[in-house]
């Protein structure tokens, strides 16, 4: 049989048995689509979590008060005297050679009000450097002014959601807010940004750190962000900062420094589990897809046993019969897989439009794997019954003996 | 052309062995016109399938054009079928999605003949069978008689020497049945060897040579009158 005739024969089959072809095509397309959508959503979630950690630059260290023992062993039984991390500590760190910026941080919930509207908001006390380190952008107005650490000023920058809730459609810049027993003038509004490390910056208010100390009546810092000039000597810089703090804290090393790497490695288990979950989802959907395609292919071929009998009676060798069925199955499988990938890409693009913060994308391995699994199952489960029918005595296939005896 | 020697075909049904063909000897010359009659289950369809190489014998030998077929593999048998044998079935066995023309063309396609060479052959067959204005119709749009004509067209398009017809008029009314049988007889007049399996006495007697089968044996053959004991003159 000539290749062109084989193609024409198969195309006629697809064109003139529309329902059957549509069914097989749909089965393959839906299967491939399911795999791609599920892995796309899973990957999107994973990338989202990873992206959250990447919000911190690689050259940013986070210092927390207190020593977290991570090496195991018996925890210290004697009560630890945890000294506060103070603004003076932060200032000392800022003077170190490799340190380019330091952002002290005090945070807490605080009742914020404007005229009669009031709301509990996440209140952050920090400085100008905080904006650069946390990659916060100001949509209107400006960031906090450059001030010495200990000097306060009655100004604040607020998140976009907080602005909307307190001011509605009215302009907020230059207006006064009340927080606790202090008043702050709004000098900037943050650009809309999703959550970062658990803080929803859209609902936050940022004031100078000295003001926050007064507001919360607390001298100790919640944490200190330290930005290094370069990544080289990250380890040494960490050592020097720790040594400095030890010296300042009467020989006791009572702070913990977290790097992005250590944060990521701490979350590695979670990320690995997430990857496994995505792979599991992909695996299950591939299995379901395979069985779906298998059933439709089996039905398609067994309906045509009589046709196989006829082809054999007309002198068509078993090899050609198998070729006819395999080539038809490949055409269906490939176009079905392509269709499935196309639809899933379209849906994921729509999802990205709706939720821009989550990067829904199907990894290449899932696209390739789904197309491969669809093609292989479609071929396999067209090949097995076709082969069986092709090897039947022509007379049995013509009468479709299986059905006859049942 | 055809030589059957002690040909057997038995089926196992349950624990009973049924002899559909029981040691058959048969010789058919080129250009003969035979009918095979007999009650249901007498083995006439099995005989036709055997002659058409659709089935394999359990014993004995079948020579087609001096070729012993019992030792041939399925591929070689397929080639013999393609080149020497045409089939006409009671239920037509047309492919429903293909037009009349495409159904007739199918054997040529399977044989790998180029489209340019196919066209004049099919045109001739379609004209010969008076199907010109039905050529673009699919089987469901054709009458029974037309369907059987398409099936005959498909059977003869490869110019076989042997045409095997299994109850070719079984699904047809008497008028289209007669047309079909006359068409087959015309083809026989043009030189094709024709074997018709039928229930219908009226069709059976039209053949030049009549075989009657009972219980897997040829009970009578009009070419070889039974040797009945004769009284000495």
Predicted regions located by residue number:
Chain B
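ABC-family P-loop ATPase nucleotide-binding domain
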Residues: 1-10, 220-233
């Amino acid at each position: 049989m000539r290749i062109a005739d084989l193609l024409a024969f198969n195309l006629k089959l697809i064109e003139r048995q529309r329902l059957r072809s549509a069914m097989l095509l749909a089965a393959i397309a839906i299967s491939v689509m399911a795999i791609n959508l599920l892995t796309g959503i899973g990957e999107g979630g994973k990338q989202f979590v990873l992206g959250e950690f990447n919000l911190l630059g690689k050259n940013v260290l986070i210092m927390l008060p207190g020593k977290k023992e991570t090496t195991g062993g018996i925890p210290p039984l004697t009560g630890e005297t945890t000294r506060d991390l103070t603004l003076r500590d932060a200032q000392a760190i800022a003077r170190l050679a490799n340190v380019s910026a330091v952002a002290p941080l005090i945070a807490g919930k605080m009742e914020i009000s404007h005229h009669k509207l009031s709301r509990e908001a996440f209140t952050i006390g920090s400085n100008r450097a905080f904006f650069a380190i946390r990659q916060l952008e100001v949509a209107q107005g400006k960031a906090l002014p450059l001030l010495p650490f200990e000097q306060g000023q009655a100004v604040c920058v607020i998140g976009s959601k907080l602005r909307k809730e307190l001011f509605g459609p009215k302009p907020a810049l230059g207006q006064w807010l009340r927080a606790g027993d202090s008043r702050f003038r709004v000098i900037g509004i943050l650009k809309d940004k999703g959550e970062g490390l658990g803080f929803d910056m859209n609902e936050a208010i940022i004031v100078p750190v000295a003001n926050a100390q007064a507001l919360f009546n607390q001298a100790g810092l919640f944490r200190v962000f330290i930005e290094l000039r370069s990544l080289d000597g990250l380890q040494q810089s960490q050592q020097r900062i720790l040594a400095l703090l030890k010296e300042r804290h009467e020989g006791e090393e009572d702070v913990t420094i977290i790097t992005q790497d250590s944060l990521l490695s701490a979350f590695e288990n979670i990320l690995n589990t997430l990857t496994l979950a995505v792979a599991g989802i992909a695996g299950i959907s591939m299995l379901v897809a395979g069985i779906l395609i298998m059933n439709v292919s089996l039905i398609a071929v067994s309906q045509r046993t009589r046709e196989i009998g006829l082809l054999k009676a007309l002198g068509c060798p078993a090899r050609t019969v198998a070729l006819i069925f395999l080539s038809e199955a490949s055409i269906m499988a490939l176009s079905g897989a392509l269709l499935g990938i196309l639809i899933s890409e379209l849906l994921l693009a729509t999802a990205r439009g709706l939720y821009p913060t989550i990067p829904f994308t199907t990894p290449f391995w899932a696209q390739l794997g789904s197309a491969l699994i669809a093609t292989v199952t479609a071929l396999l489960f067209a090949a097995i019954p076709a082969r069986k029918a092709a090897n039947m005595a022509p007379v049995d296939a013509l009468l479709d003996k299986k059905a006859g005896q049942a | 052309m055809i030589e059957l020697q002690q040909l057997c075909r038995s089926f196992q049904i349950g624990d009973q062995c049924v002899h559909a063909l029981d040691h058959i000897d048969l010789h058919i010359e080129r250009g003969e016109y035979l009918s095979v009659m007999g009650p249901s289950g007498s083995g006439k369809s099995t005989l036709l399938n055997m002659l058409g190489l659709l089935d394999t014998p359990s014993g004995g030998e079948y020579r087609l054009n001096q070729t012993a077929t019992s030792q041939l593999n399925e591929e070689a048998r397929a080639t013999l079928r393609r080149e020497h044998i045409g089939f006409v079935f009671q239920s037509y066995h047309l492919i429903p999605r293909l037009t009349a023309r495409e159904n007739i063309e199918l054997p040529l396609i399977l044989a790998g003949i180029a489209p340019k060479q196919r066209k004049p052959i099919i045109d001739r067959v379609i004209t010969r069978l008076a199907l010109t204005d039905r050529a673009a119709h699919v089987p469901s749009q054709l009458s029974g008689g037309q369907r059987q004509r398409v099936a005959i067209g498909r059977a003869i398009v490869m110019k076989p020497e042997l045409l095997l017809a299994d109850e070719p008029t079984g699904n047809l009314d008497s008028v289209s049945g007669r047309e079909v049988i006359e068409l087959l007889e015309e083809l026989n007049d043009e030189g094709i060897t024709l074997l018709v399996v039928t229930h219908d006495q009226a069709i059976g007697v039209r053949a030049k040579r009549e075989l009657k089968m009972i219980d897997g044996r040829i009970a009578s053959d009009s070419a070889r009158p039974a040797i009945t004991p004769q009284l000495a003159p």
